[in-house]
């Protein structure tokens, strides 16, 4: 009976507690509860990748702001808009830009004429020095990283100025015409047509050769910046669009597509979708580089140390830690290069001494920036340095002349951390015949050269056949018991140069287990060196991969030693080649 009464009491208390809970007022309103439920129901992580699109902002004493249409256009196109605050703090901007996958440079005030070498004209209107500084800083950082860019109105003018072009400061007085470039109608009302160049990226994007646009500007391009082309014109010959594709991922329009896009225009919307798609590819390229180990197998940077160059500073040289970071490059081979000199005993000994000093200079240089980089001797060193957030520097020797007359020097170089030796340079030496200035390109290794190959195999130093004659190449294939490399050579099938490798050589190198590294030297890439670009280099890379296989092809730029071309002028540009591989459908 007692237990039964206790059970009834507990049930009664429970009912009272439930009634009390129901009568207690919920601290959250029904509207807020519904909103929270909506957020929870749609939080499904990892389903889709949304690229982060920076939007340049304007500044006033009370606020930093941007027109809502820019934000809406990015969201409608599948991007995440990020409004970049106006500041001249380089480190803050660097960290912001390094996270972005694409950028929209927006409309706004006139650009100060001093940035394009002109004096203020009487009709110059409002300028914003703070915004000019901010925009130009962000644009440089974005361009250095090969980030896809869309410039709108002022944004187009900004790109032109940043790369060396000039502007009309006031169209009505400096380029009078019947076209009114400052319409009074609403932004969704087109007021004049533009003619689009048929082969342009803009024509490809919009699918149009004539487009009706709005217009809200009194300045315009006067002289076009190098590296760009005008791809659309107004009826009065004012440039309405420019682009730097395929070398740089930049396109600019003088009209305002964001207004049309936010209002539902599907043609203008394509511009933003194009940017977001490019940004998505760029985002994927960065993620791939975060997972893989990327190495440039040949540079001649140590030659510049004596001139005050430093790997820690972003200067004119092509190789530096900041540029490696911008291009997402993990490691660099620094070659101790020695010119071919006389082959007598005294001259050969001087070559050994010079090479030793160059190698030591590499250690000295890296020591100065040990918080940011380190010497790597092995793959494990590279993996460790990447985990530590540091860049890795391997050491090579270019020209076996550095060995002198004594095989013992090879062991000395091994102890100093040398990972490969290029057997020769542009002239024959005691080891082998060169591909360039040679008595006979069919000749190969000398007797001493065969001993060098044997000793390098024994010590675990890679044999580099770049610069070697075909005869030397085939001799090394024959006598080497280990895989060999060509640290900086391109495809002879695409550019018939004595420094490049035939398809037969590429296949033999792959069969040997070795690797051929694409060289970014213009004369090796295009029969017309002045016309060479990173696009040509991408074709060489694609061909070499198809012939030798992807596991047997790499990159050895020859930066700071003759390498470089339009669109490939430093470590920061190397991510372009990854982007091209993605666009060509290569697997991750």
PLM region descriptions:
Residues 247, 328-329, 418-420, 459-461, ...:
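Glycine-enriched alpha-helix->loop->beta-strand junction motifs that scaffold or abut catalytic
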Residues 5-13:
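Sec-dependent N-terminal signal peptides
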Residues 2, 21-152, 160-161, 168, ...:
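N-terminal beta1-alpha1 cap of cysteine-dependent amidohydrolase-like domains
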Residues 416-470:
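Metal-dependent enolase-superfamily TIM-barrel catalytic cores that perform enediolate-based chemistry
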Residues 17-19:
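Sec/Tat signal peptide C-region and signal peptidase I cleavage site
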Residues 231, 238-245, 251, 321-322, ...:
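Short, surface-exposed beta-strand/loop micro-motifs that present aromatic residues
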Residues 284-440, 496-506, 510-517, 521-555, ...:
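N-terminal hydrophobic targeting/anchoring segments and the immediately downstream early-domain regions
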Residues 165, 380-382, 406-410, 433, ...:
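Distinct, well-ordered alpha-helical segments
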């Amino acid at each position: 009976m007692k237990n039964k009464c206790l059970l009834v009491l507990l049930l009664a208390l429970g009912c009272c507690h439930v009634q009390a809970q129901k009568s207690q007022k919920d601290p959250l309103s029904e509207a807020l509860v519904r909103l929270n439920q909506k957020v929870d129901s749609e939080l499904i992580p990892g389903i889709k990748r949304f690229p982060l699109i920076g939007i340049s902002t304007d500044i006033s004493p009370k606020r930093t702001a941007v027109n809502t249409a820019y934000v809406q256009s990015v969201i409608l196109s599948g991007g995440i808009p990020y409004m970049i605050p106006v500041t001249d703090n380089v480190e803050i901007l660097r960290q912001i830009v390094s996270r972005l996958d694409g950028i929209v440079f927006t409309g706004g005030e006139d650009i100060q004429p001093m940035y394009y070498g002109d004096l203020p004209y009487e009709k110059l209107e409002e300028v914003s020095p703070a915004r000019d500084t901010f925009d130009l800083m962000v644009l440089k950082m974005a361009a250095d990283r090969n980030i896809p860019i869309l410039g709108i109105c002022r944004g187009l003018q900004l790109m032109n100025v940043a790369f060396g072009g000039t502007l009309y400061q006031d169209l009505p007085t400096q380029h009078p015409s019947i076209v009114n470039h400052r319409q009074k109608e609403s932004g969704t009302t087109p007021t004049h047509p533009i003619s689009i160049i048929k082969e342009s990226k803009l024509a490809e994007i919009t699918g149009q050769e004539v487009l009706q646009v709005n217009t809200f500007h009194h300045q315009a391009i006067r002289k076009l910046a190098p590296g760009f082309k005008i791809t659309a014109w107004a009826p009065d010959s004012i440039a309405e669009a420019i682009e730097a594709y395929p070398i740089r991922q930049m396109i600019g329009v003088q009209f305002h597509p964001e207004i049309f896009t936010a209002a539902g225009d599907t043609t203008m919307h394509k511009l933003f979708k194009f940017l977001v798609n490019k940004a998505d590819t760029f985002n994927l390229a960065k993620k791939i580089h975060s997972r893989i180990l990327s190495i440039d197998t040949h540079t001649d940077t140590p030659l510049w140390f004596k001139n005050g160059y430093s790997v820690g500073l972003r200067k004119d040289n092509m190789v530096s830690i900041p540029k490696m970071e911008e291009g997402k490059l993990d490691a660099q081979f620094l070659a101790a290069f020695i010119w071919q000199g006389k082959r007598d005993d005294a001259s050969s000994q001087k070559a050994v001494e010079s090479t030793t000093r160059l190698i030591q200079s590499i250690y000295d240089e890296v020591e100065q920036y040990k918080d940011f980089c380190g010497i790597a001797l092995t793959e494990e060193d590279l993996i460790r340095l990447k985990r530590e957030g540091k860049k890795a520097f391997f050491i090579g020797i270019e020209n076996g002349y550095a060995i002198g007359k004594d095989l013992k020097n090879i062991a000395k170089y091994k102890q100093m951390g040398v990972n490969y030796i290029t057997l020769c340079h542009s002239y024959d030496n005691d080891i082998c015949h060169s591909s360039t200035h040679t008595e006979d390109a069919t000749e190969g290794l000398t007797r001493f050269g065969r001993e060098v190959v044997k000793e390098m195999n024994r010590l675990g130093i890679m044999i580099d056949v770049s610069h070697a004659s075909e005869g030397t190449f085939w001799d090394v294939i024959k006598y080497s018991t280990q895989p060999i490399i060509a640290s900086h050579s391109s495809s002879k099938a695409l550019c018939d140069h004595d420094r490049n490798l035939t398809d037969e050589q590429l296949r033999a190198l792959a069969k040997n287990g070795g690797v051929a590294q694409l060289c970014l030297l213009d004369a090796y890439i295009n029969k017309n060196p002045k016309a060479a670009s990173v696009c040509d280099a991408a074709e060489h890379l694609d061909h070499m991969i198809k012939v030798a296989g992807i596991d047997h092809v790499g990159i050895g730029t020859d930066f700071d030693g003759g390498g470089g071309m339009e669109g490939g002028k430093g470590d920061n540009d190397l991510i372009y080649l990854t982007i091209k591989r993605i666009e060509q459908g290569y697997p991750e």
